[in-house]
């Protein structure tokens, strides 16, 4: 049995693991997916103190490298349930793990478009990560769906790889940073489509075109950047207090269930940023340590 099990290895999970290990706790991490979480989807990170500019994938690598240096047990398994009790149980598709405390850092996942045949084309023209899959569309026509910073960053990244990049925006304007908007407007191979929604996706085995409310556009790739939603599948049996599917925590990062903590993008808060996720992971681990030692 462990002192604490951390679920997830994004920024908050890595931070929690580092602080737990350094405080002397017997800690293990369970993660399913890429270490670093959604940091990997950022083409460039420029707002993390001490690092002027770095790619998201490089920052994720650095965080994971720090984690690995501490020899913390890592189980690459998918968590399917958490069972409360004096001893907490974390159930994966392969094993059952026990701990005194649990820190949930499962983060968020990209929102889907919610249109017919979307799942059919995932990996066959639909992607939710430009930096992960952009190179598959070199010299091809693609579209970005979304009007915020992540969509603009993805469009800039793809404009250097793809022949033409359409930006499909539901509203009549962008809601991103002015510097990003200006950079987009200076790109000759970027076409902006305001007041536009995708109504259908067409193609036999792979994406060949999209039908919008205005026209049909021939393209090979659709990159969806319309925001994120919390990953809550593992929470079904915990009866946690929630707010719009986000976990409510107190100042110590403890949930409404004693001994269950949460940090990062899975919790209800005002600011969803890398720097806040790292802080919350540290706070959660520190308070787990205090609780166990008391």
Go through the PLM ranges and name each one.
Residues 1-3, 76-77, 138-140, 195, ...:
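Phosphate-coordination loops involved in phosphoryl transfer and adenosine-cofactor binding
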Residues 2-70, 140, 150-177, 287:
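Beta1-alpha1 glycine-rich phosphate/pyrophosphate-binding loop at the start
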Residues 8-13, 107, 146-148, 264:
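Conserved phosphate-binding and hydrolysis motifs of nucleotide-dependent enzymes
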Residues 67-91, 96-99, 160-251, 292-294:
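A Rossmann-like FAD-binding core segment of flavoenzymes
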Residues 74-136, 147:
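Glycine/small-residue-rich loop that forms an oxyanion/phosphate-binding "nest" at active or ligand-binding sites
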Residues 114, 120-136, 226-276, 280-290:
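FAD-site-proximal beta/loop scaffold in flavoenzymes
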């Amino acid at each position: 049995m462990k002192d604490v099990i951390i679920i997830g290895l994004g920024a908050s999970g890595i931070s929690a693991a580092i602080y737990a290990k350094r405080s002397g706790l017997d800690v293990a991490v369970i993660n399913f997916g890429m270490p670093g979480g959604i940091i990997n989807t950022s083409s460039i990170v420029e707002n993390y103190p001490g690092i002027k500019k770095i790619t998201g994938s490089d920052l994720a690598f650095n965080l994971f490298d720090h984690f690995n240096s501490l020899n913390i047990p890592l189980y690459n398994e998918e968590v399917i349930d958490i069972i409360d009790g004096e001893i907490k149980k974390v159930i994966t598709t392969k094993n059952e793990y026990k701990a005194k405390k649990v820190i949930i850092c499962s983060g968020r996942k990209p929102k889907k478009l919610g249109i017919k045949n979307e799942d059919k084309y995932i990996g066959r023209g639909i992607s939710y990560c430009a930096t992960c899959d952009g190179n598959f569309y070199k010299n091809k026509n693609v579209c970005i769906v979304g009007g915020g910073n992540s969509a603009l960053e993805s469009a800039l990244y793809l404009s250097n790889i793809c022949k033409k990049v359409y930006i499909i925006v539901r509203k009549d304007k962008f809601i991103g940073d002015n510097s990003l908007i200006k950079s987009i407007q200076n790109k000759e191979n970027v076409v902006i489509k305001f007041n536009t929604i995708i109504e259908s996706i067409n193609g036999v085995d792979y994406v060949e075109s999209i039908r919008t409310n205005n026209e049909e556009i021939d393209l090979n790739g659709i990159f969806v950047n319309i925001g994120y939603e919390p990953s809550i599948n593992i929470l079904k049996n915990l009866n946690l207090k929630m707010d719009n599917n986000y976990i409510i925590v107190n100042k110590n990062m403890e949930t409404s269930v004693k001994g269950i903590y949460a940090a990062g993008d899975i919790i209800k808060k005002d600011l969803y940023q890398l720097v806040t996720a790292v802080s919350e992971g540290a706070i959660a681990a520190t308070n787990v340590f205090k609780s166990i030692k008391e």
